[in-house]
Amino acid sequence: MSEILQVRNLTKNYGGARGLSDVTLALESGKIIGLLGSNGSGKTTLLKMIAGILQPTSGTITVDGMTVGTETKKIVSYLPERTYLNSWMRIRDIIDYFEDFYEDFDRANAMRMLASLGVNENAKLRTLSKGTREQVQLVLVMSRRAKIYLLDEPIAGVDPVAREFILETILSNRTPNSMILISTHLIADVEKVLDSFVFIRDGKLLMKQDVEKLRESGKTVDELFREVYRCL
């Protein structure tokens, strides 16, 4: 598979603090990749810069050969850690909004997944449980036919049933040419869907590795993560 995302010498400063420090990374299409680190490690900062929401202090990001900007936003689907949807909106209005705003939005696929959740399209977002709201937002993001999906902590704060639905939704909506980058600190829960992973800490890239190669050595991603972080 070809490299769909290239990050070179990426640094992001917030006043006197450094959010990312000289990160260089290349990720391939057709993979589900874990961006793994503790809270405050720089995961969200990196995702926001790939999505074009934050500008780097220095360094470059290219998505499918293009510098991050208006054109790359058309092929990048981003799930933020915190919702940006108004709680008073009805589900059908949110679907209409996504269909109007994104040319690659697959309404039929979104409706199919929402039906499997038992979500009434006339329901207001605020009437749904937290877990169901999280699932609805993921359905919307994964119903775009994007080349890159950026998912920021998609399974945080939801119950085990909701987590299983979220992971199944990610798996069932992957395509051979898309790349899914999942940011999380809940490594044991997500590692079963990963093809490879990246460890990040204090804004610095620690390592990148294939999951299958790690398993051949007799370790899990969660075990390696604990070992690496204990040594630092």
Task: Please give the residue ranges for each predicted region.
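Walker A (P-loop) phosphate-binding loop of ABC-type ATPase nucleotide-binding domains
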Residues: S38-G42
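Catalytic Walker B motif of ABC-type/P-loop ATPase nucleotide-binding domains
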Residues: Y149-E153, V158
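Helical segment within the ABC ATPase nucleotide-binding domain
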Residues: R163-P176
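Helix-to-loop junction immediately C-terminal to a conserved catalytic motif
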Residues: A51
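ABC-family P-loop ATPase nucleotide-binding domains
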Residues: E81-V136
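Conserved ABC transporter NBD signature motif
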Residues: G59-T72
